[in-house]
């Protein structure tokens, strides 16, 4: 019975319905399908058995989709492969080709390494260090050149005495003579200052222009100051407010009065409870201390009002 024609072509409606088949014919059709199924199962079993008989080497090297029937056909075409078995032909040929390719690869790699030898790690480190030292040397040379240029410019600005425009020979002679005699160089003359500048930064004491910043203990130039520091520093006629509170850090260098200030309790006739341990003076009053005491009493009267 043709199954393809039965399922592919639909029934023609013009012809009408076919008469129902007899039960005997239907039994024959069922028997035929069972026979075909058993035959297909036998064929599948034979194919599976043939695959199990093929060696593992051949399975790995060959294509998995090829069936043993196609392999047998290829084998039967050539007579040269008759005396050899399947496993021997495949394994020997593949192993020989692999060994040859491996040897060729090793030889090519050795030739390349011999032609272009790679640097050792020590040599590479030395090379990197040499490059770094070259860069640092270049930077130092640039800095030294810039410094030499500045020194030359300064030397050109200076004029040695007696040289004039005679050139470099006169400079060399003068420098040689100075080195031989070891005479001290003359001090550079002080810069001339205007009278207004002097009056702004000095105070006249005993016919001298004394640095006013020195008198205030604020001069930061010290011995390099252009004005005189030869004077006694007079303290201001005021009481140090930090001394009264007990934490003046300047001590004797403070510009304000500390223990020299007169004690208002002792000099007004009241009892000073501090006694000899008083932080202010119990000495006899002078003209200056009398003025200071009067100022203190005036401030107290104003505060009481």
Swiss-Prot record:
Residues 139-160 have a biased composition (Basic residues). GO terms for biological process: apoptotic process; negative regulation of DNA-templated transcription; negative regulation of T cell differentiation in thymus; negative regulation of transcription by RNA polymerase II; positive regulation of thymocyte apoptotic process; positive regulation of transcription by RNA polymerase III; response to antibiotic; snRNA transcription by RNA polymerase II. There is a cross-link at residue 44 (Glycyl lysine isopeptide (Lys-Gly) (interchain with G-Cter in SUMO2)). Residues 39-55 have a biased composition (Basic and acidic residues). The modification Phosphothreonine is found at residue 33. It comes from the Eukaryota. Residues 25-38 have a biased composition (Acidic residues). Residues 1-191 are annotated as: Disordered. GO terms for molecular function: DNA-binding transcription repressor activity, RNA polymerase II-specific; RNA binding; RNA polymerase II intronic transcription regulatory region sequence-specific DNA binding; zinc ion binding. Pfam families: zf-CCCH, zf-CCCH_9, zf_CCCH_4. Component of the little elongation complex (LEC), a complex required to regulate small nuclear RNA (snRNA) gene transcription by RNA polymerase II and III. Acts as a transcriptional repressor of the GATA3 promoter. Induces thymocyte apoptosis when overexpressed, which may indicate a role in regulation of thymocyte homeostasis. Sequence-specific DNA-binding factor that binds to the 5'-AGGTCTC-3' sequence within the negative cis-acting element intronic regulatory region (IRR) of the GATA3 gene. The N-terminal region and all three C3H1-type zinc fingers are necessary to induce transcriptional repression. This is Zinc finger CCCH domain-containing protein 8. It comes from Mus musculus. The gene is Zc3h8.
